[in-house]
Amino acid sequence: MIARLAGRIAEKRDDHAIVDVGGVGYLVHLSQLSLASLPPPGEPAALRVYTHVREDALDLYGFATEDEEAVFRALIDVKGVGPRAAQNILSGIEARELAQAVAQGDVARLTKVQGIGKKTAERLVLELKEKLVALARAAGPARAGAEADVLEQLRTALLNLGYRPPQAEGVAEALRDSAEGRPLDELLREALKLLRG
């Protein structure tokens, strides 16, 4: 079972990257947040990996952080949530924010994430509340630290996606007034829309 890959980023696509390790290219499925945190193609990178073995395929799911991997593994233990669905959920909400919403039983927050309906949100709260409570505590009551530097995270993500520093800075400044309390993935989607014009 593959648990970690370290090599160079060969390609970055909408939902995956190809990591070149010793001349072999591994296709690794990634959430939008992990994908945005990767360096540009040609640069070295290391990813935590979950190997999903099926009868007809072997899929790799990658994570930029330990928290994201822990939440992913918890999500796939929930009935009706497979690896693809878990990855899609983590594209719509940061791992710690999801853990906090589950720990607080915040069904309304969970249903704002694409791919999570009311029944799935209730199931997540019911099945994961105890598993994710430690991670939720680490997130803090108001995520003040994350909110304070979300614009810096946005700039870094845009630079890693290949945008020039003036472009990243300009879009971050344009979104400054609306950034407070919004998750990085939401701001990143809006920033990409602005950049694509």
From Swiss-Prot:
Under InterPro entries, the record lists: DNA_helicase_Holl-junc_RuvA_I, Hlx-hairpin-Hlx_DNA-bd_motif, NA-bd_OB-fold, RuvA, RuvA_2-like, RuvA_C, RuvA_C_sf
* Keywords annotated in UniProt: Cytoplasm, DNA damage, DNA recombination, DNA repair, DNA-binding
What GO terms in the biological process aspect are recorded for it?
DNA recombination; DNA repair
Q: Which Pfam families does this entry report, sorted A to Z?
A: HHH_5, RuvA_C, RuvA_N
Q: Which family does it belong to?
A: Belongs to the RuvA family.
What CDD domains does the database record attribute to this sequence?
Answer: UBA_RuvA_C
What is the protein's species of origin?
Anaeromyxobacter dehalogenans (strain 2CP-1 / ATCC BAA-258)
* Region ranges (Domain I): 1-64
Q: Does the keyword DNA-binding belong to this entry? A: yes
**SMART domains named in the record:** HhH1
The region called Domain III is annotated at: 146-197
Q: HAMAP family from the entry?
A: DNA_HJ_migration_RuvA (MF_00031)
Q: What is known of its domains?
A: Has three domains with a flexible linker between the domains II and III and assumes an 'L' shape. Domain III is highly mobile and contacts RuvB.
Q: Main role?
A: The RuvA-RuvB-RuvC complex processes Holliday junction (HJ) DNA during genetic recombination and DNA repair, while the RuvA-RuvB complex plays an important role in the rescue of blocked DNA replication forks via replication fork reversal (RFR). RuvA specifically binds to HJ cruciform DNA, conferring on it an open structure. The RuvB hexamer acts as an ATP-dependent pump, pulling dsDNA into and through the RuvAB complex. HJ branch migration allows RuvC to scan DNA until it finds its consensus sequence, where it cleaves and resolves the cruciform DNA.
Q: Which GO terms describe its molecular function?
A: ATP binding; four-way junction DNA binding; four-way junction helicase activity
Q: SUPFAM superfamilies attached here?
A: DNA helicase RuvA subunit, C-terminal domain (SSF46929), Nucleic acid-binding proteins (SSF50249), RuvA domain 2-like (SSF47781)
Q: What is this protein called?
A: Holliday junction branch migration complex subunit RuvA
Q: Does the keyword Heme apply?
A: no
Region spans: Domain II: 65-141
Per UniProt, subunit arrangement is:
Homotetramer. Forms an RuvA(8)-RuvB(12)-Holliday junction (HJ) complex. HJ DNA is sandwiched between 2 RuvA tetramers; dsDNA enters through RuvA and exits via RuvB. An RuvB hexamer assembles on each DNA strand where it exits the tetramer. Each RuvB hexamer is contacted by two RuvA subunits (via domain III) on 2 adjacent RuvB subunits; this complex drives branch migration. In the full resolvosome a probable DNA-RuvA(4)-RuvB(12)-RuvC(2) complex forms which resolves the HJ.
- Where is this chain's protein located in or outside the cell? Cytoplasm
Q: What are the GO cellular component annotations?
A: cytoplasm; Holliday junction helicase complex; Holliday junction resolvase complex
What ranges does the record give for the region Flexible linker, renumbered to this chain? 141-145
